[in-house]
UniProtKB/Swiss-Prot annotation:
Record's GO cellular component terms: cytoplasm
Site keyed Transition state stabilizer: positions: 38, 257
Native source organism of the sequence: Bordetella parapertussis (strain 12822 / ATCC BAA-587 / NCTC 13253)
Record NCBIfam families: argB (TIGR00761)
Gene transcribed to yield this protein: argB
Name this protein carries in UniProt: Acetylglutamate kinase
Chemical reaction(s) catalysed: N-acetyl-L-glutamate + ATP = N-acetyl-L-glutamyl 5-phosphate + ADP
């Protein structure tokens, strides 16, 4: 199978010049600002999308923005579990994580996936550095207990899954000041050193809050948030989100994504978007063009 060409590579010089001209006011506006990107979905597994993501992140850094990448790795974890004869289980979009699964999560996210992303960014001219929650005490966590919808008095034990208690941003800010691009694996650590698997959407949202990010972009495998008829919802308010939760329009893996996005919007992140990671250069389209892509989340 031949690799699909990057659409940017076939644009005429005039169109490229127009795109650059359109980007200029956004580059000015966001210069020096932090942009947190949750990297996941097809953009992590398709080669052409991996390349466009890496180029986008490096370009954003070169023009004066401060991208911070928080990555997922669900398919890679599932593959590793299958190789040892285990099947992944989810409750309300959160992976149930026993001790053996936690070992796999640490190895896959903090090792294989993180290093692949770091190398990919560095190969196209960036300076990326990988972090887990243990580095600089970045992500401190406690064991998460899920609400049992059938019996709220009996919470569900989902294993080594964590709730964030504190994010210590000093190490991220130090890397940004030295022109590095932080790449963060969603693994937190308890006071006793216990490792916890934390949903990457939750980590991205909290990281955006603590860093005072200008924007939070959540990459997904859909055009954005869709209604029950499959139509893209361009913007969502807090009230609309509550209604979509209640009627089941937002469910499964989209639940933590939207909840974390709304929390970030409520806690000072100026702009929160769910973007289609299957679109090449979706980060540049969302940040540096008039059009944008996906769904905007508002706290109002």
């Amino acid at each position: 199978m031949t690799d699909t060409p990057d659409p940017a590579a076939v644009l005429s010089p005039a169109v490229k010049a127009a795109v650059l001209s359109e980007a200029l006011p956004y580059i000015r506006r966001f210069h020096g600002k932090t942009i947190v990107v949750k990297y996941g979905g097809n953009a992590m597994t398709e080669e052409r999308l991996q390349r466009s993501f890496a180029h986008d992140v490096v370009l954003l850094k070169l023009v004066g923005l401060n991208p911070v990448v928080v990555h997922g790795g669900g398919p890679q974890i599932d593959d590793a579990l299958r190789r040892i004869g285990k099947q992944g289980t989810f409750v309300q979009g959160i992976r149930v994580t026993d001790a053996e699964t936690m070992e796999v999560v640490e190895w896959v996210l903090g090792g294989q996936v993180q290093q692949d992303i770091v190398m990919m960014i560095n190969e196209v001219g960036g300076k990326a550095v990988g972090l887990t929650g243990k580095d600089g005490m970045l992500i401190q966590a406690t064991k998460k207990l899920m609400v049992n919808k059938d019996d709220p008095s009996q919470p569900l034990d989902i294993g080594f899954v964590g709730d964030i208690t504190r994010v210590e941003p000093a190490v991220v800010k130090a890397l940004q000041d030295d022109q590095f691009i932080p790449v963060i694996s969603p693994i937190g650590y308890g006071e006793d050193g216990t490792a916890y698997n934390i949903n990457a959407d939750v980590v991205a949202g909290k990281m955006a809050e603590v860093l005072g990010a200008e924007k939070l972009l959540m990459m997904t495998n859909t055009p954005g948030v869709l209604d029950k008829g499959g139509k893209l919802l361009r913007s969502l308010s807090a009230q609309t989100i509550d209604e979509l939760f209640a009627d089941g329009t937002i469910s499964g893996g989209m639940l933590p994504k939207i909840s974390s996005s709304l929390d970030a919007a409520k806690n000072g992140v100026n702009s929160v978007h769910i973007v289609d990671g299957r679109v090449p250069h979706c980060l540049l389209l969302e940040i540096l063009t008039d059009q944008g892509v996906g769904t905007m989340i508002s706290s109002h």
